[in-house]
Structures are given as structure tokens and as C-alpha cells.
């Protein structure tokens, strides 16, 4: 049976929009929500840990923590074309 499951992780991440006409051109941050949706067949193998599941929620959460949260939470992400911010961050 094909089904979908969804998990998310939230981060607090800083950035700026260098050429924006508003205050967004200044360094600031947001609360971001990253969502992963997985679609596939339910595991029908008898006796395995994931039996009756598409994937264990805890496994998805571990992946999201490792690949997203631990990378960008309380971090500052910089647009590669933002030479001014990149130069400033080189001195930190």
C-alpha cells in the first residue's frame, strides 16, 4: 500500500537580502520550518522493525537533525553573491 508521511524540523537562522530596498538588506534572522515528505510502500516484511510502516519517524527525525538542523540552526547563511557579507564574515 502506497502512503505518505511527513516530518519537520525548525531552525533559527540568520541571513540578509543584500540589495533589497527594505530593512531586509540588514542582518536578521527567522524561524524556519524544513519539511520532508516521504512516499512509498508500507513495509510488509514480517518481524522487521519497520513492519507496517513506510519508515520509522525517529529515523526521519535523525536525518533531518543531522542534515538540516545541525547545519543551519543558530547559523548565518550567506548568498554566494553577497561579497560584502562574505568579506565581513572572513574576519570572524
Regions found by a protein language model. Name each.
Residues 1-92:
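Charge-rich, low-complexity N-terminal segments
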Amino acid at each position: 500500500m502506497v502512503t505518505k508521511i511527513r516530518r519537520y524540523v525548525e531552525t533559527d537562522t540568520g541571513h540578509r537580502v543584500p540589495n533589497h530596498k527594505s530593512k531586509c538588506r540588514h542582518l536578521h534572522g527567522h524561524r524556519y520550518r524544513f519539511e520532508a515528505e516521504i512516499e512509498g510502500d508500507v513495509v510488509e516484511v514480517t518481524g522487521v522493525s519497520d513492519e507496517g510502516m513506510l519508515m520509522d519517524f525517529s529515523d526521519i527525525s535523525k536525518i533531518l537533525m543531522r542534515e538540516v538542523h545541525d547545519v543551519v540552526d543558530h547559523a548565518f547563511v550567506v548568498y554566494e553573491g553577497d561579497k560584502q557579507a562574505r568579506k565581513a564574515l572572513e574576519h570572524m
